[in-house]
Amino acid sequence: IMPSLVGSEMCIRDSDNTAVDLLEECGNPIYKIASFEITDVNLIRYAASKGKPMIISTGIATIEDLELAIEACHSVGNNDITLLKCTSAYPAPLEKANLLTIPDMKERFGVKVGVSDHSLTNTLPIVAVALGATVVEKHIILDRALGGVDSGFSMSTNEFKKMVIAIREVEQVMGEAYYPEDPWSLSARKDSRSLYIAEDMKTGDIITELNVRSVRPGYGLHPKYLKDCLGKKVNRDLEKGERMKLEYIQK
């Protein structure tokens, strides 16, 4: 029920080939390989052969383990692979997270990345998303009083909701690495500085740092041109408060 409430698909972990067959009969859309099954390349290959997305936790995996697991998927034509950075401790200590592994795995193996988190906070998933994670695994418990093997590091539904909200905010603030001249940026130019006429000037007056100054708003000539203006004569009468322009300089 919970996956449908948060807009995600049900994902069930498989443990052997017969489990894969059963999950296929049930219409399972995604296969999840746990950290402790990372070395079972035959299981990985069989699950991958079904053509469904593969999510693989990496808690105990060496680089060789990951290479073999990815190759097992590729060998049956499955390239839809997501590696989850995972610390195989329950609960997992924050200082062992090593989340910089996430962008490294993405670049090193050319796959999608995510995080499988067993820590006691929502910090790891939020940071992981900022580092490029597209999948987050976090345990949920409806009532801690019920107990259970993972109750000590599972989130309540309310805690999970707060984590999802925070992750969505991270996705918004990350944006893109470029410098657009969008409407917001252009409107903010009014708070920058530019060159304006600071004193009334007559034709032939010499430009100095007193009669042409860098002030707000930012709609005048860029301050970088001040050095090109100093010592030059103006070719017309100018009033205090006018925007300075290069065309006002005598040739």
Map each language-model feature to its residues:
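Single conserved hydrophobic/aromatic residue that forms the stacking wall/gate
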Residues: 1-7, 11-12
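Conserved SET/PR domain catalytic loop and adjacent active-site segment
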Residues: 172-251
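Short beta-strand/loop segments at the ligand-binding rim of alpha/beta enzyme cores
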Residues: 8-9, 28-30, 53, 108-114
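Alpha/beta enzyme core
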Residues: 17-29, 37-53, 62, 68-83
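Short beta->alpha connector loops at strand-helix junctions that form conserved
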Residues: 32-35, 57-59, 139-140
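Conserved, mostly hydrophobic/aromatic
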Residues: 23, 57, 83, 132, ...
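Glycine-rich beta-to-alpha transition loops that act as phosphate-gripper elements at the mouths
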Residues: 13-17, 37-38, 59-60, 115-121
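Catalytic alpha/beta core domains of metabolic enzymes, predominantly
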Residues: 63-176
